[in-house]
Amino acid sequence: MPDRAEQIKKQASDLYKQRGYKQAAQLFSEAAELYRLEGNELEAAEMQNNRSVAFLQSGDAAKALQAAAGTDQVFALAGDVRLQAMALGNQAAALEELGRHPEALDLYQQASALLKSTGETEMRSTILKRISSLKMRSGKALESLAAMDAALTDVKPGTPKEKLLRKLLNFVNRRSW
């Protein structure tokens, strides 16, 4: 069974890379079930998270949320803080797509705190950018700027937009209060 689960996992990953998101989601589900049957709950949860991302890419946020639900707890029990944060981020992304912004914001903030504790700056930066966007949409401009500032602080801004934002935030920080 382990070989079969690995084969299906690889097929699902290949389909995902080819943008066959719905088919990939189905195969990730099959792989998750095989891992579950062999008692490998961590790998099963990882497959559910991959399934969630595939559903989100296919435009089905409700199924994405359902697929990722509870996986953060599996990772928390195993002590894998990084995967726990990623699972929370996947759930938050689905909630955001469903328009459930306060819930999404809460999960993004939990994910950010977990990632900060691991020193994982790139993923945390991505999460903080989502937090910034949600704060801006809710009319909390200063909180949005603070989140974006934090998002760009620990990583080297790569895109022209990020470089401009960094310069603007530096200017604002020098002039403020």
What are these regions (language model features)?
Residues M1-Q7, E38:
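TPR-adjacent "capping" and linker segments in tetratricopeptide-repeat scaffold/adaptor proteins
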Residues E6-R19, Q26-E33, L42-Q57, A68, ...:
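Conserved alpha-helical positions within TPR/SEL1-like repeat arrays
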Residues S29-L34, A69-A76, Q110-L114, G119, ...:
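Amphipathic alpha-helical segments of tetratricopeptide repeats
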Residues L37-E38, A45, V74:
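Tandem repeat protein-protein interaction scaffolds
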Residues G39, G79, G119, K156-P160:
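Structural signature of alpha-solenoid helical repeat scaffolds
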Residues L105-A113, S117, S125, K129-T159:
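TPR/TPR-like (Sel1-like) alpha-helical repeat modules
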